[in-house]
Amino acid sequence: IHLCGNIDYDILIEGYKDLGINFKVFTFLEQMHYAYSGSNLVVSRAGAISVSEIAYFKIPVIFVPYPYAYEHQMSNALVLKEKGCAIVIDQKEFNAGSLRFILEPLITDAEILKNMRLAFEGIPKYNAAESLVREVMPL
């Protein structure tokens, strides 16, 4: 699955077709849980919502933080990297060659992805809504 927005949609459809790769390309998905539940690995920016969703679904991830977000995305990505759930690459270094270099061991050694997925177990789960209700109700 490749989410790309409107600008690159036609180029990506043709590119995957030319390469003989069976990919589903979407400009947008409202039901992201369908995409996440069918994923073994995600390549993503590192916005707070994306990081939260990826952590919720416990999907190994390669983050390419958006460099113009005042380092917020890098900070978000490093949280999962430090736990062993993510690989982080700076956008300046991100290209087809660097992605291939990162992907090859992940594709050829299933233990790497398995260990990345297991590393999510070490991340505490917070239920912010429930905690807020518990704090507010006695008032």
Annotate each language-model stretch with its function.
Residues 1-41, 74-78, 91-99:
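Donor-nucleotide binding loops and adjacent catalytic segments primarily
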Residues 5, 47, 65:
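Short glycine-/small-residue-rich Rossmann-like dinucleotide-binding loops
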Residues 37-39, 53-64, 83:
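Conserved donor-binding/catalytic loop of nucleotide-activated donor transferases
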Residues 44, 60-70:
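Short hydrophobic beta-strand element within catalytic cores of glycosyltransferases
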Residues 57-58, 74-86:
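Acidic, glycine-centered active-site loop in nucleotide-sugar glycosyltransferases
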Residues 83, 87-90, 94-111:
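C-terminal "capping" alpha-helix adjacent to the active site of nucleotide-linked donor transferases
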Residues 105, 112-126:
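A short, well-ordered alpha-helix in the C-terminal region of glycosyltransferases
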Residues 125-139:
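C-terminal alpha-helical cap of glycosyltransferases
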